Amino acid sequence: MNPNQKIITIGSICMVVGIISLILQIGNIISIWISHSIQTGSQNHTGTCNQSIITYKNSTWVNQTYVNISNTNVVAGKDTTSVILAGNSSLCPIRGWAIYSKDNGVRIGSKGDVFVIREPFISCSHLECRTFFLTQGALLNDKHSNGTVKDRSPYRALMSCPVGEAPSPYNSRFESVAWSASACHDGMGWLTIGISGPDDGAVAVLKYNGIITETIKSWRKEILRTQESECACVNGSCFTIMTDGPSGGPASYKIFKIEKGKVTKSIELDAPNSHYEECSCYPDTGKVMCVCRDNWHGSNRPWVSFDQNLDYQMGYICSGVFGDNPRPKDGKGNCGPVYVDGANGVKGFSYRYGNGVWIGRTKSNSSRQGFEMIWDPNGWTETDSNFFVKQDVVAVTDWSGYSGSFVQHPELTGLDCMRPCFWVELIRGRPKEKTIWTSGSSISFCGVNSDTVDWSWPDGAELPFTIDK
């Protein structure tokens, strides 16, 4: 083939390739135009797909998925419809308590990033339950955990995480700077109450959905403090109790009515011979019942019940099955304070059912060890020590600590009644064990009208940690 023939052949091949490329490009343009015309004709059409269930990390979310045909973007989000938690239901009838959660925080914290905490509690909205806790601004098995036996410091904060999970920097949400706290959900948003500051001038900061809405200054200038468990919400209003004054003598106690984070009413209890600290409160048939700690002179628990106008009644649980720690052996009760071993105490709870009462208490009379639930069918009004049911949840050889109530509203459970639940703090470290830190994990139980079991669900961490050696 001579040079001219080669040139003609190469030119012909290039021309054919060019023509094919042009045809493909024209086809592509026509395809894009047709596709655009179809989308333009349906530009404002939005289709709603069926609900989908996504299961991840043991949590089940119900999602509504929206597909916008015009740009094919898919947006999936959890149904967060707001409802007002009525709080008008009575407590569900129950026969015992079923294990609900266990976070194993201290065990996991020996190798994982887990917060040093105390005072954990649980609160539920109509969508979820969360564990709230007071951190010490430190992680387990780290140098900053040294000295965390101290209750009040500027490093403490109220945080929360999904119930049953160990509290870590990766799953926890900051709520408030606080060394004493409470939180609850009214169906529309989270109310958090965080107290911080000096002993003689602490301030409670109220937040609603994360925004500061109100502050309450210490009125007695002697360690303003609140529940260390959930507040109670009824028909859009939430209620909490605060204490200011001596821990070993008469103090001042106030009930606050709060709507969307703003205090709308408050009263001071007329209780010269009673002592109310760290109350565990729950709604019941439109009213609020609180069972508290008498740190002054009672080994049985004081209670106060009030309506939405803050008209209140008060007294002590009459049963000879005593609920505080320290306490004497069960015996003759009193509808006022039982003075034997009445000094000091521990946060606790009870649930009233008419004249009967479920009493939660440590198994030990003198130390924060073990935990049991006792049903006394006439213990709210009678002073004998006879009881009908006892359910063990922590063995007397294992550490316990604070305990408190929380409820699951019908809007969450689908039941026609208020489900009673409780949590138990499992304290580890100082002052009882040879560590440089104090922390804890938690377990929780909910009332059921079916079979339950006696067992022990202890913290289970093997101490000391590396940092302690």
From Swiss-Prot:
As recorded in UniProt, its EC number(s) are 3.2.1.18
Known activity regulation?
Inhibited by the neuraminidase inhibitors zanamivir (Relenza) and oseltamivir (Tamiflu). These drugs interfere with the release of progeny virus from infected cells and are effective against all influenza strains. Resistance to neuraminidase inhibitors is quite rare.
Q: How does it assemble?
A: Homotetramer.
Which UniProt keywords are given for this protein, alphabetically ordered? Calcium, Disulfide bond, Glycoprotein, Glycosidase, Host cell membrane, Host membrane, Hydrolase, Membrane, Metal-binding, Signal-anchor, Transmembrane, Transmembrane helix, Virion
Q: How is it modified after translation?
A: N-glycosylated.
Q: Where is this region: Head of neuraminidase?
A: 91-469
Catalysed conversion reaction? Hydrolysis of alpha-(2->3)-, alpha-(2->6)-, alpha-(2->8)- glycosidic linkages of terminal sialic acid residues in oligosaccharides, glycoproteins, glycolipids, colominic acid and synthetic substrates
Q: Please give the residue ranges for the topological domain Virion surface.
A: 28-469
- Its GO CC terms? host cell plasma membrane; membrane; virion membrane
Anything else known? The influenza A genome consist of 8 RNA segments. Genetic variation of hemagglutinin and/or neuraminidase genes results in the emergence of new influenza strains. The mechanism of variation can be the result of point mutations or the result of genetic reassortment between segments of two different strains.
Q: Which segments does the topology annotation call Intravirion?
A: 1-6
Q: What is its main location?
A: virion
Q: Looking at the keywords, is Metal-binding present?
A: yes
Protein name, UniProt field? Neuraminidase
Query: So where does Ca(2+) get bound?
Result: 294, 298, 324, 344
The disulfide bridges present are 92-417, 124-129, 184-231, 233-238, 279-292, 281-290, 318-335, 421-446
> Glycoprotein: present as a keyword of the record?
yes
How does the entry describe the domains? Intact N-terminus is essential for virion morphogenesis. Possesses two apical sorting signals, one in the ectodomain, which is likely to be a glycan, and the other in the transmembrane domain. The transmembrane domain also plays a role in lipid raft association.
Location(s), subcellular: Virion membrane; Host apical cell membrane
- Stretch list, region Involved in apical transport and lipid raft association: 11-33
**Positions annotated to bind substrate:** 118, 152, 277-278, 293, 368
